[in-house]
Each structure stands twice: as C-alpha cells, then as structure tokens.
Amino acid sequence: MRLNTIKPGAGSKSAAKRVGRGIGSGLGKTCGRGHKGQKSRAGGFHKVGFEGGQMPLQRRLPKRGFVSLTAARKVEVRLSELDKLPVDDIDLLVLMQAGVVPADALSAKVVLSGTIGRKITLRGIGATKGALAAIEAAGGSVATA
C-alpha cells in the first residue's frame, strides 16, 4: 500500500447530487424545487421560527429563569486525581497550579471516583459523603474554610 493508492472504502462515499443537468437525471430544469413560489427562488427561505406573520411560539411563551454564569465554574474533582498530586495539603490554588481545574474555577468538589491511598487534607474544597468517608478512612481530613 502506498499513499497514492489509498481510497475510501467501497460504498462509503456517495456522489454529489448534480442538479439542472437534463431530464434524464431526474433533477433537471427546476432542480427538484417544483414550480414557482418562494421556495423555488434563490434566497427564498424565511428565517427559522418564522410562522408566516403569526406571533411565533418563542414569543408567545413567557420567559422563565436564567442561565447561571457561575454554574460552569464549579468543578468536580475525582478522588483518583487527588491521589496523583505531589502535595498533602490541597486547596483550590493547588488544584489550579496542577492543572486539575481550570484557572477560572470558583469552587471545586471532590467526588468518589477511584481510590486514595494516602493521607491528605482538603482546605476550602467540598466533598461528597462517599469521598469524605474515603479520605477519612485513609487518615486524611476535610477542613472547611
């Protein structure tokens, strides 16, 4: 096999639909658009959600709630990721420097995923019940604030 002989698998690629190339193609003359009307013209499509002048559904329904900007900056950290860190005293800054959480993270929470085999101390980081039990079983502790 050489680079110049590589081909896609048989039947994996279909030929492009060529329109306006004669009656025999089945897509000649009007190119599958039918006769006249807005949809047959170039640029003849209305915007998404347009209902012909009727008040659109997205404007008829009331607005509700909002998208929290801080929700995306709350990060989950696995227990197995903490086990790989070289330090025993772990806070949010340590996690950022190690690249475990992104630099714009506002808070972190440890979840029970994997195991921990050494004593660590968490400072200012939340932990689930399972993660807390695993950390304490390994001789570690969680200090709030």
Curated annotation (Swiss-Prot):
Pfam families: Ribosomal_L27A (PF00828). The keyword rRNA-binding applies. It comes from the Bacteria. GO terms for cellular component: cytosolic large ribosomal subunit. Residues 21-31 have a biased composition (Gly residues). Signal peptide: none annotated. Keywords: Ribonucleoprotein, Ribosomal protein, RNA-binding, rRNA-binding. GO terms for biological process: translation. InterPro entries: Ribosomal_uL15, Ribosomal_uL15/eL18, Ribosomal_uL15/eL18_sf, Ribosomal_uL15_bac-type, Ribosomal_uL15_CS. GO terms for molecular function: rRNA binding; structural constituent of ribosome. The keyword RNA-binding applies. Residues 1-43 are annotated as: Disordered. SUPFAM superfamilies: Ribosomal proteins L15p and L18e. HAMAP family: Ribosomal_uL15 (MF_01341). Binds to the 23S rRNA. Belongs to the universal ribosomal protein uL15 family. Part of the 50S ribosomal subunit. This is Large ribosomal subunit protein uL15. It comes from Aromatoleum aromaticum (strain DSM 19018 / LMG 30748 / EbN1) (Azoarcus sp. (strain EbN1)). The gene is rplO.
